Amino acid sequence: MTGLDRLSYQSRWAHVAPQRKFLLWLAMMILAFVLPPVGQGIELLIIAGLSCWLLRISLWRWCRWMAIPFGFLLVGVITIIFSISREPQMLLAGISVGPYWIGITRAGVVTANETFWRSLTALSATLWLVMNLPFPQLISLLKRAHIPRLLTEQILLTWRFLFILLDEAVAIRRAQTLRFGYCSLPNGYRSLAMLAGLLFTRVLMRYQQMTTTLDIKLYQGDFHL
């Protein structure tokens, strides 16, 4: 069980109907797109406080979860701020590179500010939904939304194999660590290469075991969701 999945089961709203959670998330997303940057910042603070209270976690831990997508968002915002132009008077600040100027424009700063707060608020709302929606409730929500059965089964299998992959990786790395496989940088690279090779082999073996189990149970191509 991953950290996010474990948190979703300890949420104060773990047993609240998934439809209500989805509707609340939808309202959060609509507000994230229609509010001005100041309103988006206020919504972000409300979502952060609600997430910490529901999940019984500290604000620091929530910020660490948000730091993962924040890095990608920051790179995107930086690319919006900077522009290339032949007319330096259009730039607030810039440097010349041959016949071109690279710098910051007023429109770029405004767009970057709006994009930053809108995206960060939408990300926090989506993270709230993920951390408060256990996987069985997600499957139930997909069924109620009449998502094609094949797609739902694919999501279920992908989720299962994700856990298999993580379990095998943790077991192999623990065994390598006990044998001082990561005591130095060269040994670490060597152990990492061995982990990748063993992981591929063991996941294939687990897949074959699951296929055999399904055949024994007279699997006809449909999972009972």
Swiss-Prot record:
<keyword id="KW-0171">Cobalt transport</keyword>
<comment type="function">
    <text>Part of the energy-coupling factor (ECF) transporter complex CbiMNOQ involved in cobalt import. The complex confers cobalt uptake upon expression in E.coli; can also transport nickel with a very low affinity.</text>
</comment>
<dbReference type="GO" id="GO:0043190">
    <property type="term" value="C:ATP-binding cassette (ABC) transporter complex"/>
</dbReference>
<comment type="pathway">
    <text>Cofactor biosynthesis; adenosylcobalamin biosynthesis.</text>
</comment>
<dbReference type="GO" id="GO:0009236">
    <property type="term" value="P:cobalamin biosynthetic process"/>
</dbReference>
<keyword id="KW-0169">Cobalamin biosynthesis</keyword>
<feature type="transmembrane region" description="Helical">
    <location>
        <begin position="65"/>
        <end position="85"/>
    </location>
</feature>
<keyword id="KW-0997">Cell inner membrane</keyword>
<keyword id="KW-0812">Transmembrane</keyword>
<dbReference type="GO" id="GO:0006824">
    <property type="term" value="P:cobalt ion transport"/>
</dbReference>
<comment type="similarity">
    <text>Belongs to the CbiQ family.</text>
</comment>
<keyword id="KW-1003">Cell membrane</keyword>
<keyword id="KW-0170">Cobalt</keyword>
<dbReference type="InterPro" id="IPR012809">
    <property type="entry name" value="ECF_CbiQ"/>
</dbReference>
<dbReference type="InterPro" id="IPR003339">
    <property type="entry name" value="ABC/ECF_trnsptr_transmembrane"/>
</dbReference>
<comment type="subunit">
    <text>Forms an energy-coupling factor (ECF) transporter complex composed of an ATP-binding protein (A component, CbiO), a transmembrane protein (T component, CbiQ) and 2 possible substrate-capture proteins (S components, CbiM and CbiN) of unknown stoichimetry. Expression of just CbiMN in E.coli confers some cobalt uptake.</text>
</comment>
<feature type="transmembrane region" description="Helical">
    <location>
        <begin position="150"/>
        <end position="170"/>
    </location>
</feature>
<feature type="transmembrane region" description="Helical">
    <location>
        <begin position="122"/>
        <end position="142"/>
    </location>
</feature>
<dbReference type="InterPro" id="IPR052770">
    <property type="entry name" value="Cobalt_transport_CbiQ"/>
</dbReference>
<feature type="transmembrane region" description="Helical">
    <location>
        <begin position="90"/>
        <end position="110"/>
    </location>
</feature>
<feature type="transmembrane region" description="Helical">
    <location>
        <begin position="22"/>
        <end position="42"/>
    </location>
</feature>
<dbReference type="Pfam" id="PF02361">
    <property type="entry name" value="CbiQ"/>
</dbReference>
<keyword id="KW-0406">Ion transport</keyword>
<protein>
    <recommendedName>
        <fullName>Cobalt transport protein CbiQ</fullName>
    </recommendedName>
</protein>
<keyword id="KW-0813">Transport</keyword>
<keyword id="KW-0472">Membrane</keyword>
<keyword id="KW-1133">Transmembrane helix</keyword>
